[in-house]
């Protein structure tokens, strides 16, 4: 499955520790590390929520219903998966402390921490602390050997499987089709393409829908919890085109499609870099670098071209406070040197950089850069009693971080 999203190799040569993460939420603990400018007044109430078996979007929806407000008034810095015990921050516009204190949601503990003058944004999140129990993994000797090798070569910062979907890893495929201006096929891949691992009954319905492309049948057969698929099919029944239907999706979901395709190309670039160089510590002409900023916890900040101050950049990489950065390609990306290999990957899909400027803003992207190396030295990593504890800067995936140790596929 990993190869389908561009994760094609390991950087370490050690044997895997093996093991698996069980389905119990307590085995996967994640806590946001964030910085806010709090005050005693402001239009935005800031809350800290400890929740179990709640994904972020569903929690925000249920919370808005409990408060009797629009979900648009609730903001957060990042999304968290359902199958975990999570601590996360939310801002709520125009709600008082007394109102939130009357809310009681199952498996969720809500604590008011203050007010702010603006909503929570992605930039407020520095990173996440993880505590993950792995069942059936081997002893700590392999752990130490792998850790040492990662310190020497770098720790690959792939986008994890969850970037591409929860059970059906098709988000990047939808993004590719949108960039190809093939909205009809993008619509049906999202709504109907069957995928191994999905609920058997639902998969069979999708198989029929994939063959027939019958919106009426889909509305009759697809379960109600697949609300986005059903909403799209309803738009077709109302006479809208596949393109118009896709544009009716929530903004954050629309943006995910092209972002997922960018992530797929990034993963392929990172895999190829590892294969060619065997290390993420080597810098070439035309490369970019990302720098750590040390706040409450370290987080990656600006990127720059290596040649702008080559001696300084090489020194910072050697001192482990800067990382090689690879492009998240977009219409403004300037590819130089080694990274021009991205053009070959795009060409395989009949795309180029200009393809990322579409007629719809939410399906366009100018591009950016992402650190290739997680810099394991700053994670505070420990391993005791089959439990990994570590911190990762925002945008880094715990399952990706662990894969070099376990050498097993983690979704």
UniProtKB/Swiss-Prot annotation:
This is Probable tRNA pseudouridine synthase D. The keyword Thylakoid does not apply. The keyword Isomerase applies. It is an enzyme of class 5 (isomerase). One of its GO terms (biological process) is tRNA pseudouridine synthesis. InterPro entries: PsdUridine_synth_cat_dom_sf, PsdUridine_synth_TruD, PsdUridine_synth_TruD_CS, PsdUridine_synth_TruD_insert, TruD_catalytic. It comes from Archaeoglobus fulgidus (strain ATCC 49558 / DSM 4304 / JCM 9628 / NBRC 100126 / VC-16). GO terms for molecular function: RNA binding; tRNA pseudouridine(13) synthase activity. Keywords: Isomerase, tRNA processing.
């Amino acid at each position: 499955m990993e190869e389908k999203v561009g994760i094609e190799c390991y950087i370490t040569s050690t044997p895997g520790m093996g093991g698996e993460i069980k389905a119990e939420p307590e085995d996967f603990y994640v806590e946001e590390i964030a910085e806010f400018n709090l005050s005693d007044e402001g239009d935005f109430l800031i809350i800290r929520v400890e929740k179990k078996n709640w994904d972020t979007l569903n929690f925000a929806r249920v919370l808005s219903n409990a408060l009797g407000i629009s979900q648009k008034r609730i903001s957060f810095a990042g999304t968290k998966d359902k199958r975990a015990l999570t601590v996360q921050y939310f801002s709520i516009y125009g709600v008082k402390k007394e109102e939130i204190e009357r809310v009681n949601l199952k498996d969720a503990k809500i604590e008011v921490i203050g007010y702010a003058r603006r909503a929570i944004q992605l930039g407020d999140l520095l990173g996440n602390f993880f505590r993950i129990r792995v069942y059936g993994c081997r002893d700590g000797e392999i752990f130490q050997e792998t850790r040492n090798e990662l310190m020497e070569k770098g720790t690959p910062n792939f986008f994890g499987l969850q970037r591409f979907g929860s059970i059906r890893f098709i988000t990047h495929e939808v993004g590719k089709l949108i960039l190809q201006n093939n909205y009809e096929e993008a619509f049906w891949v999202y709504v109907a393409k069957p995928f191994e691992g999905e609920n058997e009954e639902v998969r069979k319905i999708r198989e029929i829908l994939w063959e027939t492309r019958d919106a009426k049948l889909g509305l009759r057969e697809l379960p109600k919890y697949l609300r986005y698929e059903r909403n799209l099919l309803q738009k077709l029944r109302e006479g809208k085109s596949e393109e118009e239907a896709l544009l009716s999706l929530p903004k954050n979901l629309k943006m995910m499609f092209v972002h997922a395709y960018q992530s797929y190309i990034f993963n392929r670039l990172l895999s190829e870099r590892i294969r060619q160089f065997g290390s993420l510590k080597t810098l070439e002409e035309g490369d970019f670098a990302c720098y750590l900023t040390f706040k409450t916890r370290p987080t990656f900040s600006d990127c720059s071209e290596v040649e702008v101050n080559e001696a300084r950049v090489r020194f910072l990489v050697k001192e482990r406070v800067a990382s090689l950065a690879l492009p998240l390609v977009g219409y403004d990306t300037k590819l130089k040197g080694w990274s021009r290999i991205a053009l070959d990957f795009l060409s395989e899909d009949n795309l180029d950089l200009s393809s990322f400027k579409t007629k719809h803003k939410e399906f366009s992207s100018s591009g950016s850069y992402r650190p290739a190396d997680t810099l394991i030295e700053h994670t505070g990593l420990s391993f005791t009693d089959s439990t990994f504890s570590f911190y990762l800067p925002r945008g880094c995936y715990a399952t990706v971080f662990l894969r070099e140790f376990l050498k097993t596929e983690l979704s």
